[in-house]
Structure formats: C-alpha cells, structure tokens
Amino acid sequence: EPFRPFAWPIQYIQTVGYPIVGLGVIDTTLVVLTQGRPYFIQGSHPSSSIMVEADINQACLSKRSIVSMGNAVFYASPDGLVGLSPGGSAVVTESLFDKFTWQDTGPADLLGCMYENKYVGFYNVSSGIGGFIYDMKAKTWNFHTVYATGGYNDLKNDALYIIQSNELSKWDSGTALSYIWKSKKFTFPEPKSFACYRVQAEGYPVTTKIYRDGVSIVSLSVTDDSLRRLPAGLGTDWEFQLE
C-alpha cells in the first residue's frame, strides 16, 4: 500500500526461486533479476499483484549492469546482454558475437547506463579498460575506450554523467574521439573485381582501408566523396574499414 512498508502485511510477500540480484521496472511491472531465471511482478496494488516467471534461462551476473530502458530491462548474463520484457525476452548480442567474446568484457563487474535509447557499458578486465554501446533501434554494437566507475542518467537535462578518476564528466560533450568501423567479411562464390569506391561522410578526412583476400590494397586518407579507382585484381573475400 502507498506509504506503507513494502512487505507489510505478510500476505504481500512474494517469493522467488533464486537469490535476488537486483530490480528493474517496465511501466507497472516490476522485474526481479536473480541468480537463476528472472521474474515479472505485475499489478497496481500489492494485494492483487501476480508473479510470473520469465521465459528465458539467463541469470543476472551484475546488479550494476541492470538498466531500465522504456519497454525493456537490460542486464548482463553469462551468454550476453539480455533484453527482458513481458512481450518477449532474448540475448540481444547473440547474433553479434559468441559467449566467449562476451566473457572478455567482464560481465560480472559490468556497469550499465542509458543514453539516448542506447545501452552504454563500462568494464575493467585484465586485458584493459573500456566499454561498449548497444543501439536498441539499429541493433548495432560498438566498442569504445572510455572507462567509468559510476554513472547517472539525468532525465531532466537529457544527460548522462559518469565518474572518471573521482571526477564527474558529461557523456558525449567533450572532444570527439576517433572511431573505427570495419565491415564483415564479404565472401563471394567466385573471385570478383571492383573498379572504384566512394566514401560519403559528414566530415573529412576519413582513413579508408580495403582488404582483398586478407591483403590491404587501399590505405588512404580520403578528403572528399570523389570516385577513386581500386587496384586491379580479383578476390573472393572483401573487407572495408573506415576511421
């Protein structure tokens, strides 16, 4: 009841089957993340609330990884980043990389934040510090080199504040960082040759690299969107990188 202790009277107590790690919220639904399966508690009043076990076998590894983002709650599981909602749940990173690559980000100590409908993660592992950004709408994943020990999403000012070396910083407000994008490997059934390429960007210069059968055939700082010729030759595997 409003303004009453959450578990009083005793009839209001809900019991889950695993130790609780943390909580999330979706509208009027409370999301309970545990060391086993997650649960939904739905209802407008404690006396009429209903608890439902989620349809996904993914434990929550880190309380600090839990982020409530509109119609879903995201958290770190052993297999990847999970998006959880009453309408359906899934490991959203499953198609991006495998379980072992995910483990390299240290999900047990992952810090999660929200910014512009994106999940921003920060990690500190033996191989180094850094983080990643998962865009829910575009279904894309990008790594970054920024590390933070804490974060706060200020809805009033539409800003994300992070803690770096005991100092407060505003996300996406400082000097622009370099960005590297590399395509997947395009494999053709027969060797192919391409005549030219064009790089269209919001700003220049853009360092462009093109690989044919694993060998770099172009490495050039492009300053405009002019057509440029490719070196002659056939290749089965093609990759493209922009920086």
Report the location of each language-model feature.
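N-terminal beta-propeller domains
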Residues: 1-40, 121-134
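Generic low-complexity segments that are intrinsically disordered, proline-rich and/or Lys/Arg-biased
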Residues: 3-6, 10, 47, 206, ...
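A short beta-strand motif characteristic of beta-propeller blades
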Residues: 7-14, 50-55, 98-100
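Loop-centered beta-sheet repeat module
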Residues: 21-74, 78
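Beta-sheet repeat architectures centered on beta-propellers
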Residues: 57-72, 78-243
